[in-house]
């Protein structure tokens, strides 16, 4: 699990190299805190601009039902997928930055349980499915290897 910043990705690449040197199977890379989605309501069809990270203007259009959403890459994005590709390990997915996960932990009700159809729950579920697929595969293993 990594965050999208270069210093975290460097640590992840080192960890992958270390695991490979010990012949420890690597399930894959997960990018955590990958984008923060702001949501709101406005006049249907209106367009406004949000000042994103790095001073980048992001145009947002309000949908017919009056809702809008914009995802800001606060900590960058795509680094997990790029690291997985460069190191030849599977990319398991990206988990959004969600303050509700922290609040849920403090309140004793995990965000995934409280909001099973939410963005975070769907992202976690997609990652978990890939991990389950990996674990359920018949691994050709001769047991432990002394190195």
Question: Which functions belong to the PLM regions below?
Answer:
Residues 1-16:
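Conserved Switch II/interswitch segment of TRAFAC-class P-loop GTPases
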Residues 16-147:
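C-terminal lobe/tail of nucleotide-utilizing enzymes
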């Amino acid at each position: 699990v990594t965050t999208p910043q270069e210093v975290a990705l460097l640590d992840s690449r080192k960890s992958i190299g270390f695991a490979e040197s010990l012949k420890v199977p690597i399930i894959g890379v997960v990018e955590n805190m990958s984008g923060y989605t702001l949501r709101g309501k406005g006049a249907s069809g209106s367009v406004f601009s949000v000042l994103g990270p790095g001073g980048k203007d992001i145009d947002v259009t309000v949908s017919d039902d009056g809702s809008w959403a914009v995802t800001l890459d606060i900590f960058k994005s795509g680094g997990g997928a790029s690291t997985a590709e460069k190191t030849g390990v599977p990319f398991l997915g990206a988990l959004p930055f969600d303050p509700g996960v922290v609040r849920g932990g403090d309140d004793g009700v995990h965000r995934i349980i409280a909001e099973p159809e939410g963005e975070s729950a769907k992202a976690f579920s997609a990652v978990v499915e890939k991990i389950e697929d990996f674990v359920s595969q018949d691994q050709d293993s001769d047991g432990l290897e002394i190195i």
